[in-house]
Amino acid sequence: MKTFWNIDKNLTVLNEWQPNCWIQVTCPTDEDQRLLEDEFKIPDYFLSDISDTDERARYEYDDGWMLIILRIPYVKEIRSRTPYTTVPLGIIHKRDVTITVCYYETNMMIDFVSYQQKRNEGFTDYVDMIFRLFLSSAVWYLKRLKQINSLIEKAKRNLDHGVNNESLIGLSRLQDSLTYFITSIRGNENLLSKLKFKLQVDELDADLIEDVNIEMTQARETTSIYSDILESTMDTYSSIINNNMNTTMRTLTSISIVMMLPTLISSLFGMNLLNGMENSPYGFAFALIISVIVSALSWGFLRYKRLL
């Protein structure tokens, strides 16, 4: 799906392309790709790079075209292997043509358009738009991090009532998401540090870049803190599981010892040897009493040693 936006003031939709407008392409169809490649003559590998979910944040030039790939947050199904991840957003520019391409429909881009319309100021130029996309991505990383923290706290509350596989698996998935976040944020920071020297930055852009740096730093540090907390939490519950397993094995071993003693005594009295009790009518009762006494003493000893 493609949309032509007039970047002046309230960001209105245009019926067709005009010079210096913004072409927003989301989940591009074959027709959209042909339009970009045939009409605007952008390098064909630009789109293939943007469609690669593992493409790192970077920029490059080819035949007058500039390609910027920014990593932005994206939410899958909550029960998926990595519910929160990042996807590439491509920014393509040449003279009076500015195009953004994303192969996923993200809340960030929807909110970006809505927010710019509320500002009712538009973009001063394509450089202003690029850095505002950086700012929006940082803000949305922070929003997603709050959601991740909420899920972590929920899983921890469930684990406080009893360790279960579902909550532990959920924490493991969130750890994977935080790994994707921290890697992408660092990549975006490196990209930003390079672009501010490559693009024509005016005084307003410099102020905007400072805001982006602040938000990016906060997002990176928050992700790092949550990742450390989650790792510590996982280690704690792993220790609890190991401790519970050791306690269970110790208890079972102690019970086995207590149960073994009557069997041992019965075996001794049951041997074909002279023991003075083979002809006594009280032999069985005597063996039974000894078994009970020995078992009780062993039980008391193990309880005293806190092995039961």
What label would you give each PLM region?
Residues 1-197, 201-202, 211, 215-222, ...:
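Peripheral, non-transmembrane regulatory/ligand-interaction domains of membrane transport proteins
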Residues 35, 41, 217-308:
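Hydrophobic alpha-helical transmembrane segments and their immediately adjacent juxtamembrane loops
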